[in-house]
Swiss-Prot record:
Family from the record: Belongs to the universal ribosomal protein uL13 family.
Organism this protein belongs to: Ectopseudomonas mendocina (strain ymp)
Keyword Ribosomal protein in annotation: yes
Record protein name field: Large ribosomal subunit protein uL13
A GO molecular function held by the record: structural constituent of ribosome
Summary of the function given for this chain in its UniProt record: This protein is one of the early assembly proteins of the 50S ribosomal subunit, although it is not seen to bind rRNA by itself. It is important during the early stages of 50S assembly.
Quaternary structure and interacting proteins, as annotated: Part of the 50S ribosomal subunit.
Domain of life assignment: Bacteria
GO cellular component: cytosolic large ribosomal subunit
Length: 142
């Protein structure tokens, strides 16, 4: 009996919508990353993108536990000497709530071209409205 290998052209991808309101950031991100990789499917193949599309709404209502709201730091660099920037969770969630979830999920995906393709299937929006109603996403309870 041969081992089954999924073909990229035969993979069926579904659309799911996840409500981040009141969810813990890390627990939400691990489930989303697993779904983007396709590990929940029986036809999962490590070298093929078998994951689904995930639409996250209410990104500004995600929460963290303990003192992480003030202690958790996000770093960026301008590329110039001494150009490192630092912002904590509270300020980033107020300025760009989508980036908090995107950063958490991206860190849980493979660091290669396949991981970048998986990351492109993640759509994060603040508020309950999203432009993907034509895809008829199913609600995913996490």
């Amino acid at each position: 009996m041969k081992t089954f290998t999924a073909k990229p052209e035969t993979v069926k991808r579904d659309w799911f919508v996840v409500d981040a309101a009141g969810q813990t950031l890390g627990r939400l991100a691990t489930e989303i990353a697993s779904r983007l990789r396709g590990k929940h499917k029986p036809e999962y193949t490590p070298h093929v993108d078998t994951g689904d599309y995930i639409v996250v709404i209410n990104a500004e209502q995600v929460r963290v536990t303990g003192a992480k709201a003030s202690d958790k730091k996000y770093y960026s660099h301008s590329g110039f000497p001494g150009g490192i920037k630092e912002i904590n969770f509270e300020k980033l969630i107020a300025r760009a709530p989508e980036r908090v979830i995107e950063t958490a999920v991206k860190g849980m995906l493979p660091k290669n071209p396949l991981g970048r393709d998986m990351y492109r299937k993640l759509k994060v929006y603040k508020g309950a409205a999203h432009p993907h109603t034509a895809q008829q996403p199913q609600e995913l309870k996490i």
